[in-house]
């Protein structure tokens, strides 16, 4: 992978292969879906299932999503070039979700520094497929798995590039001129280190598109695009990875999922006043919780605080903002955390236990790094 002078992976050079011209800012005149086709917009930062660390993409939830036969147009937000296409027919390294996959992912270059990323398209438009060579086109339209492949297909603002239906559309903006400060060690993210350049989509949409998106947005406080970077040196807040597990990429040979070594202390993507504890291996499964009493605040916890105890409870707000009625309010488990020198953390989860039943770490405690 090409490297920048600051030591970060040069994603612009990798995606565009030196063919891009110009730099941002770029103005998006179209939403990725027509506003009238969208039920809601969920911003960056959710933690759910295998997304243990705050999620690096937003969600456009189409209307009639339960009807998988209904398809909606997916649009290019601005002029550019599709530079990466991928086709997924299975989720490798995981048995968490037993569904049939047939998803398309795209990266669009809008300048030498600004890119958009799409995922979960159910099909690609003929205007895109017809610009590809026959072998690649056959592979994309078949049932075979195709890793992300570099291409160069020109698109215009508002052009239909595919369809989505029966699922959400993933969308994110990357600006390689910006570096998020809340990722202390970008190298731990490997082939996912472009997330350190994730940019708030509301900063790029033209006023009319931005206004439409704000109406659809389930988050009503700034930053409206959400947040994913929470690391603070010497503090508990942020992302952690099981020591020796390969960072964010994790263990791809673990059938339970690469995320089993992930751990995050963050804030809710819709109500950022709420503390989230997201654990990749909570009794063998990924789980995300609120904290009873909404304290202690992980942003205030450091080495001098020693072993800190969290009582974990179910969130009363769902990932798309729905309020859960009648959910258990009892404690679902306990987490112990101790910030160590050298960006290390000692951590142990106790599913089904209460604070009174946990007196300290056991031999099951593990060390995390970042």
Regions found by a protein language model. Name each.
Residues 71-74, 144-153:
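Short, surface-exposed secondary-structure edge patches
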Residues 168-184, 213, 225, 347, ...:
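Ser/Thr/Pro-rich, low-complexity mucin-like regions
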Residues 97, 103-107, 152-175:
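Short hydrophobic beta/alpha edge segments that flank linear recognition/processing sites
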Residues 1-105, 156-157, 198-202, 206-318, ...:
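Surface-exposed, glycine-biased beta-strand/turn segments
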Residues 295-370:
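Beta-sheet ligand-binding and adhesion/scaffold domains
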Residues 117-119, 176-215:
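Short peripheral tails and domain-boundary helices/loops at the edges of structured domains
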Residues 121-124, 281-285, 350-356:
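Short, solvent-exposed aromatic-acidic interface loops
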């Amino acid at each position: 992978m090409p490297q920048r002078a600051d030591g970060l992976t040069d994603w612009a050079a990798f995606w565009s292969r030196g063919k891009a011209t110009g730099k941002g800012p770029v103005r998006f005149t179209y939403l990725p879906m027509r506003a009238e086709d969208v039920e809601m917009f969920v911003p960056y930062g959710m933690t759910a299932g295998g997304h243990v660390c705050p999620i690096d993409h937003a969600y456009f939830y189409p209307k009639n999503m339960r009807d998988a036969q209904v398809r909606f147009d997916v649009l290019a937000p601005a002029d550019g070039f599709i530079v990466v296409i991928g086709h997924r027919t299975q989720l490798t390294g995981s048995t968490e979700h037993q569904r049939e996959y047939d998803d398309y992912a795209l990266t669009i270059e809008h300048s030498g520094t600004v890119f958009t990323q799409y995922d979960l398209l159910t099909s690609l438009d003929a205007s895109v497929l017809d610009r590809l060579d026959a072998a690649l086109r056959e592979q994309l339209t078949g049932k075979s798995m195709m890793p992300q492949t570099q291409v160069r297909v020109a698109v215009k603002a508002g052009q239909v590039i595919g369809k989505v239906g029966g699922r959400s559309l993933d969308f994110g903006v990357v600006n390689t001129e910006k570096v998020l400060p809340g990722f202390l060690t970008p190298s731990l993210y490997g082939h996912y280190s472009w997330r350190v350049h994730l940019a708030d989509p509301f900063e790029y949409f033209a006023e009319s598109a931005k206004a439409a998106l704000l109406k659809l947005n389930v988050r009503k406080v700034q930053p409206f695009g959400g947040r994913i970077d929470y690391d603070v040196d010497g503090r508990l807040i942020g992302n952690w990875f099981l020591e020796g597990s390969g960072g964010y990429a994790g263990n791809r040979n673990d059938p339970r999922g690469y995320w089993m070594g992930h751990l995050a202390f963050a804030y809710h993507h819709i109500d950022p006043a709420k503390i989230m504890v997201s654990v990749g291996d909570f009794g063998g499964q990924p789980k995300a919780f609120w904290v009873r009493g909404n304290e202690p605040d992980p942003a205030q916890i450091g080495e001098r605080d020693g072993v800190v105890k969290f009582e974990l409870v179910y969130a009363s707000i769902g990932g798309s903002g729905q309020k859960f009625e009648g959910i258990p309010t009892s404690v679902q488990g306990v987490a112990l955390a101790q910030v160590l020198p050298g960006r290390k953390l000692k951590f142990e989860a106790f599913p089904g236990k209460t604070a009174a039943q946990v007196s300290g770490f056991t031999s099951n405690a593990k060390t995390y790094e970042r």
